[in-house]
Amino acid sequence: MEGVFNNKKFILVFVFMLGLCIGITTVHGQGTRVGFYSRTCPRAESIVRSTVRSHVNSDPTLAAKILRMHFHDCFVQGCDGSILISGPATEKTAFANLGLRGYEIIDDAKTQLEAACPGVVSCADILALAARDSVVLSGGLSWQVPTGRRDGRVSQASDVSNLPAPSDSVDVQKQKFAAKGLNTQDLVTLVGGHTIGTSECQFFSNRLFNFNGTAAADPAIDPSFVSNLQALCPQNTGAANRVALDTGSQFKFDTSYFSNLRNRRGVLQSDQALWNDPSTKSFVQRYLGLRGFLGLTFNVEFGKSMVKMSNIGVKTGTDGEIRKICSAFN
């Protein structure tokens, strides 16, 4: 019996030490955790949620804009709120970020949080939480957002060059995502966020009138859809017009975006390429449950990929700062 007891004791100690090691790895590897503000600012998440709800209820297009802002923040300098800084030559001024909107939501939430818990909640965390809440308000499933990020002290327009572009091939997209620790499934899943997105015509008009110098439209687009897009984006005059990336379901977070790719109705060249390339097409098919593929639940997988993305290059501990105002360094 003593031998059995000693064995059990050894196993318990081993399991405890293993758990301790895993916990240490998690803290040092990411530095964020669910419920980070549970003691220091218990109402942090509810304040952000109610703020986002108020703004999105007034303007449903803001949901996609906040989601896009979080993506752009994470892909440059990590998820540190650097996209929020105002001033000359900051990330906000880069061409790829000129169309970003919704900064007032983050500022509004920050003002309320500073009144409730001064100097506690970072702008980077507010943006991460707001992105989740925007998806939920659009009909998507919720997920737990690890918090504890600190705000970065650098914001340079010159660092924005690594953002995915609307004409990127699948190979280029995969390279850019892999550089951030994201795999091919994450790529397809996160781009699926375009289900509530829009784009200015200037980012895809090359597909409509003179694709690759052919004086014709991109043959990858369904001909009837070409006519629709040409009407929405008149040649030489409609560059700033906005078009939904998920036709017929612009404000609903669902899988119809993937159905549009299957039907050759992807607006951006980079989006339609996900259906045309075998390495990404298989994931699109799985989200649609096609041809016997093991199905994936888009809403569930989106939350998982968002957690991965939101931990890119986070600043924790004594790194960075907790800004008093999200648009300016302390």
Curated annotation (Swiss-Prot):
Entry's Gene Ontology cellular component terms: extracellular region
Cofactor annotation remark: Binds 2 calcium ions per subunit.
Pfam families in UniProt: peroxidase
A biological-process GO annotation: response to oxidative stress
Protein's UniProt keywords contain Glycoprotein: yes
GO molecular function terms attached to this record: heme binding; lactoperoxidase activity; metal ion binding
Signal peptide as annotated in the record: 1-23
Residues that hold Ca(2+) 1 according to the record: 73, 76, 78, 80, 82
Keyword Cytoplasm assigned: no
Database matches in CDD domains: secretory_peroxidase
Residues binding substrate, per UniProt: 164
Needed co-factor(s): Ca(2+); heme b
EC number(s) recorded for this UniProt protein: 1.11.1.7
Region (Disordered): 149-168
Cystines in this chain: 41-117, 74-79, 123-326, 201-233
Glycan attachment sites: 212
Enzyme class per UniProt: oxidoreductase
Keywords: Calcium, Disulfide bond, Glycoprotein, Heme, Hydrogen peroxide, Iron, Metal-binding, Oxidoreductase, Peroxidase, Secreted, Signal
UniProt: heme b binding residues: 194
UniProt site (Transition state stabilizer): 68
Family, as annotated: Belongs to the peroxidase family. Classical plant (class III) peroxidase subfamily.
Role summary: Removal of H(2)O(2), oxidation of toxic reductants, biosynthesis and degradation of lignin, suberization, auxin catabolism, response to environmental stresses such as wounding, pathogen attack and oxidative stress. These functions might be dependent on each isozyme/isoform in each plant tissue.
UniProt protein name: Cationic peroxidase 2
